[in-house]
């Protein structure tokens, strides 16, 4: 008897079935499931396949597209005879099976393959139609009902897999309310490749040869992805960057959210040079929302192709079977902008020996049926249509060049990318539609700058932190024109998270023109990297930034043409408002001198110098002159007092700031002392224990005497 393991394959019979074998209407697959425990007879019997007079326990795998696979040779269990099982079969058992002449044994393949499901009729290429599964607007693309799925019997070792419906791709991408934020995610991935030798990232517009539609290209010449990393990139939650100190990625979700926010489909080409004696590889992956919706898939499946360099040619890496390979090729060609495998491989010729090339197509449209991305307004830029684009701001940007980034970053990718990173690695280029993006530091747009060091307070005394943030605050150079430009650019690990964060929403003109820059690595960015997680640390930072802006504004606003801030009135009637601009809302500028009771007295005493009740002659003139001098002296004293009070208030503010800083330093020092004290106490206890052990050891020694 042949010792090789074979699995029966059932074939479709003609409508005229032999006696005892009913006809079937479609191709069938034996759906096998077994436990990993060989001792469990019930589970073994449930996964048996008859081979001759023996039964083979088989384990079902899952193929690339979510279906059942054929038998995996590595998972074939031991051959079990009926005698070993102690099972007696009734007479005529198995009579309903097809005759042996119609059953052909095939060798079990070592990898997963597809279920033999009849393929649906090929729909027209989605890029040529006016709709994608019913809608091309991003915010409405999730409004569809897929086929009701009831096939939940697939399991692994008795545990059910959590299934991910294709609609999750859309709902996951809604975290990006702002489309330009999705570009930033892809640029982050390219910038992280600097460690692998990347020197550029290119963002451009391409035209689809199939439908003539426009597509997005993001390409870098970094280290690329091998087949394993490509699969992690297409999966959810895999992130090797979360453990790296200088990278911002941590959720393993940015590629999926960003690409699906910009378009319905994305195809990725990546070439990875060989390392540690391994051959070079190149991979193609297709993540297509259009494909998943149009074919009624209930799980996210990703067609992929892998190649390996075997000099001088590239050879296919067949992970399961040739049939699977052909199925992946057909699917990618049908649902991608390319018409043949040769066209697919030509994309690797454009990236030379390494790198990653991402093409996003079936771009989303707005309510008017136009692309959400505007490629025509500027041939060297990619801009947004809709509410983020304000013609008034565009006109003001040409008048006030130092405020240009504040006025245009919401709709212009070139403007946003120029301030996206606090520092650009030397020699690294960001190329947007053929022209390099010029890196811009917002500090260059500022005047009368001040530098303040902010140290966050530690959450617990047991944790000592050396984190701090240097805040550079000042007026924008266009502030003298009283443009409403204000806010802080807050970076995290070199990446802009909050552009021009407006934290002081004062009425009137208070706070105008004040901008700042800081890098806060002690706060955690949110899921979309367009904000921070609301924590106590962030609340303290926000409160401190508000205080900085108020103090800077009240101290320096008169230098750019605004009125000096008024003070609270004291018990003596003087105007002595607090220096906080909250107490002053766009009013008269100078210090007002109240009219004291003495003025009213003299005015009533001398209503008319020539009247009957007035004082005439030399005495009257002398009194008038003395009165005038007293008034001038009083006014001068009031001004001096007011200036002195203003200086006192400013000194009070400075003193409060110093007290707060000293308090934070004291708390930090106390925490450090407590930690050191505990460590010293532990060390002392350890020493005492060691001494006691030494004494016990010495005492336990029995002296030996020679007789």
Curated annotation (Swiss-Prot):
A motif (Nuclear localization signal) lies at residues 633-640. Its EC number is 3.6.-.-. Residues 590-613 have a biased composition (Polar residues). GO terms for biological process: defense response; DNA repair; gene silencing by siRNA-directed DNA methylation; positive regulation of defense response to oomycetes; regulation of DNA repair; regulation of gene silencing by regulatory ncRNA. Residues 1-11, 575-587 have a biased composition (Basic and acidic residues). GO terms for cellular component: nuclear body; nucleoplasm; nucleus. Gene3D superfamilies: Histidine kinase-like ATPase, C-terminal domain. InterPro entries: HATPase_C_sf (IPR036890), MORC_ATPase (IPR045261), Morc_S5 (IPR041006). It is an enzyme of class 3 (hydrolase). Residues 1-22, 568-619 are annotated as: Disordered. It holds the Pfam family Morc6_S5. Its cofactor is Mg(2+); Mn(2+). It is found in: Nucleus. GO terms for molecular function: ATP binding; ATP hydrolysis activity; DNA binding; endonuclease activity; kinase activity; RNA binding. Disruption phenotype: The double mutant atmorc4 atmorc7 exhibits a pathogen response phenotype with abnormal up-regulation of several genes involved in plant defense. Keywords: ATP-binding, Chromatin regulator, Coiled coil, DNA damage, DNA repair, DNA-binding, Endonuclease, Hydrolase, Kinase, Nuclease, Nucleotide-binding, Nucleus, Plant defense, RNA-binding, RNA-mediated gene silencing, Transferase. Residues 620-701 form a coiled coil. Exhibits ATPase activity. Binds DNA/RNA in a non-specific manner and exhibits endonuclease activity. Probably involved in DNA repair. Involved in RNA-directed DNA methylation (RdDM) as a component of the RdDM machinery and required for gene silencing. May also be involved in the regulation of chromatin architecture to maintain gene silencing. Together with MORC4, acts to suppress a wide set of non-methylated protein-coding genes, especially involved in pathogen response. Positive regulators of defense against the oomycete Hyaloperonospora arabidopsidis (Hpa). Homodimer and heterodimer. Component of an RNA-directed DNA methylation (RdDM) complex. Forms homomeric complexes. PANTHER family: PROTEIN MICRORCHIDIA 7 (PTHR23336:SF78), ZINC FINGER CW-TYPE COILED-COIL DOMAIN PROTEIN 3 (PTHR23336). Belongs to the MORC ATPase protein family. This is Protein MICRORCHIDIA 7. It comes from Arabidopsis thaliana (Mouse-ear cress).
